[in-house]
């Protein structure tokens, strides 16, 4: 089916320029790159861009700590980020920075248009001020309890638990992240974007098909609670763009960050000497398509503020937001101490990029589900699918073609009907790539790979090769196998760019989506070289070890005043000091399927979440009753792999056992994360 070529602009969320790229980041960039590569294969004009998010107080303070300028720090970080993305073969057409002249000009233009149209309001506000550091505190440098859901240890601009946004002054019991001091109130004039004026437009846009259903439903909750005016200014000292005609006032980082999409594209157009495309893509009535791939943690900014800013400044809105979930490793949050907080560069020191690209792709769908990188499953799947099913299909046929037929394939297909089965799958697989149902696409491709290998098994070319007078049959069978390999690799081309390059070199032809309609007949292939190597758990172990920032000593045995048990043998104070007891909030409690003794507890230690299995089910038949309670846990107990998952600590309880188990709780006033001394 012939497709009409489309003009498409694709972006990924801008990585913040104060830290390295890790495997959590890579999920989004791989997802977008696979989609972009598919679009290019179908003949569409795609511009794929990104940039570093380079402004804000965190950058300013970190540069001060390093003894360098913010400009120097973000320059070095940009080079590191670009190296990592190139290592994973992310095919960006341009990678820029929000700290650029293009972004400054566009930020000022959008601000001026919003102001001219009456959407910028000035008012004096009472703002939190750090008396020890002598500075107003940006949202992310104040932490406290969320005023909406009462979750502790939340930042001053939005809650990571319930997703609500609010002013830092609304936080309960705020603290300065910079000094730990309790902030004081000081007056300051600020500029506000009148978001409520766009409520009707945003509600219509929400239901226009521009958002996934899960996102649209979440936005409806925000509409029902009412939209608030958005503070878009920050006081000096601040690293960013100064607001025109407002000395000492700077654009809030979340105003100029999404404008960075426009700035990066403008930079690309200027590099090309193209004075037309920027307006063609960004004008109000543009027919080009604009897609933002983002994580679920920044939906609020991209689904409310960003389209409203564009609407109010006479630019086009996004065609769609493609939102994904988080990455866990081995069923738990990425952990530096366990070696599962893995940087992109560390991964590339131990594995190739295609392996992770394939694993993520096989697990992705159009939904906002979290993706678990199970390292053992990763090894098994890469070996089973890429090596055993796909690459093996080429290797088991290429030898005969090279040795017996000088690399020349047969002049006709041995099984045209089977080949047509493979090419007919292009529509289903293509639709899966298009709709971001990547896991479905991979399943369809691997089902074809099974079919291809079954054909080779049944035809047994290694047997035919030994039979006199069957050279033509041998050539036909192996040529069929190689043609099926070609179709499979064409379908996988968006996912496996490096393997594709090697396959194209062997096949002596470029792999194109439409090209598979014509099989390779009477065609000379090149001598076969190993296309892909098996991986093993030793590489995983080396990766994890390299990722560990520190190895924690095993926790000492815990003693306690259990009523019916004698006091244990005396220990030294130093022994006891090894045990790190912390106050924890029970965020969730549930039964463990397959166990009549355990409850699964989700604990909040004041910024870090832990998954703990506890044998207290007999005493707490209704686990929901535990939710919201504070308890005491051993926070530095080495994680323990259990049949049901990994337990990341131990909660403290007293009693002889059975129904007589009593979970310990701290006195009123203790907060999650407080150390028990």
Swiss-Prot record:
Residues spanned by motif 'KMSKS' region: 333-337
Catalytic activity from the UniProt record: tRNA(Met) + L-methionine + ATP = L-methionyl-tRNA(Met) + AMP + diphosphate
Subcellular location, principal: cytoplasm
Record note on cofactor: Binds 1 zinc ion per subunit.
Binding site for Zn(2+): 146, 149, 159, 162
Record keywords: Aminoacyl-tRNA synthetase, ATP-binding, Cytoplasm, Ligase, Metal-binding, Nucleotide-binding, Protein biosynthesis, RNA-binding, tRNA-binding, Zinc
Cellular-component GO terms for this entry: cytosol
Alphabetical list of Pfam families matching this protein: Anticodon_3 (PF19303), tRNA-synt_1g (PF09334), tRNA_bind (PF01588)
The tRNA-binding domain, residue ranges: 575-677
Biological processes annotated in GO: methionyl-tRNA aminoacylation
InterPro entries noted in UniProt: aa-tRNA-synth_I_CS, Anticodon_Met, Met-tRNA-synth_bsu_C, Met-tRNA_ligase_1, Met-tRNA_synth, Methionyl/Leucyl_tRNA_Synth, MetRS_core, MetRS_Zn
Domain of life: Bacteria
EC number: 6.1.1.10
Enzyme class: ligase
Cofactor: Zn(2+)
GO molecular function term, any single one: ATP binding
Positions of short motif 'HIGH' region: 15-25
Binding site for ATP: 336
Subcellular location: Cytoplasm
Assembly notes: Homodimer.
NCBIfam families xref list: metG, metG_C_term, PRK00133.1
Function (record text): Is required not only for elongation of protein synthesis but also for the initiation of all mRNA translation through initiator tRNA(fMet) aminoacylation.
Recorded family membership: Belongs to the class-I aminoacyl-tRNA synthetase family. MetG type 1 subfamily.
Name of the protein: Methionine--tRNA ligase
Lineage: Bacteria, Pseudomonadati, Pseudomonadota, Gammaproteobacteria, Enterobacterales
